[in-house]
């Protein structure tokens, strides 16, 4: 049973990828050169054997270098086009919608009724947060107690 079927996934030893995982040269295909798809392509490359520690220790450095080069390549292309596109550019996600932070920003911040309301609600929120922080324990006490709890449970487990 040491020989595998010729059609099996593992028969080739993992060398039948269209691009090897340590091929660090910047790609020129449209999927990774487009800054909108850059997040997808780099996270896709991280999957597989690299996330399960099946490769030697120095190969993680090589694959990380490749991801950086891919990002640099996309940035260079944006500069050649004359900056980012008007419709949001790299800030947009895959479906062309802006991310939540950009969506919530108001274009005209100088309108007086908006700024006064905004600062008022922000001030109220911080006041409430201060009240709730005064009631709770300090971080030092919390961490001390959690360490004690851990130690006690370890001692209980030993017995």
From Swiss-Prot:
Residues 1-139 are annotated as: Disordered. Residues 9-31, 105-119 have a biased composition (Polar residues). InterPro entries: SMG1_N (IPR035175). Coiled coil: none annotated. Residues 65-82, 125-134 have a biased composition (Basic and acidic residues). This is Putative uncharacterized SMG1-like protein. It comes from Homo sapiens (Human).
């Amino acid at each position: 049973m040491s020989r595998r079927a010729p059609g099996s996934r593992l028969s080739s030893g993992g060398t039948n990828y269209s691009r090897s995982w340590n091929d660090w040269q910047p790609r020129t295909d449209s999927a990774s050169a487009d800054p909108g798809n850059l997040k997808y392509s780099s996270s896709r490359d991280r999957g597989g054997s690299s996330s399960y520690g099946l490769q030697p220790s120095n190969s993680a450095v090589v694959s990380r270098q490749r991801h950086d080069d891919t990002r640099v390549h996309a940035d260079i292309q944006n500069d050649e086009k004359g900056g980012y596109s008007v419709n949001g550019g790299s800030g947009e996600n895959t479906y062309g919608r802006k991310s939540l932070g950009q969506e919530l920003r108001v274009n005209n911040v100088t309108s007086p009724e908006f700024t006064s309301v905004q600062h008022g609600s922000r001030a109220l929120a911080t006041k409430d947060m201060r009240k709730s922080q005064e009631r709770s324990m300090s971080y030092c006490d919390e961490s001390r107690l959690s360490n004690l709890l851990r130690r006690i449970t370890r001692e209980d487990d030993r017995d």
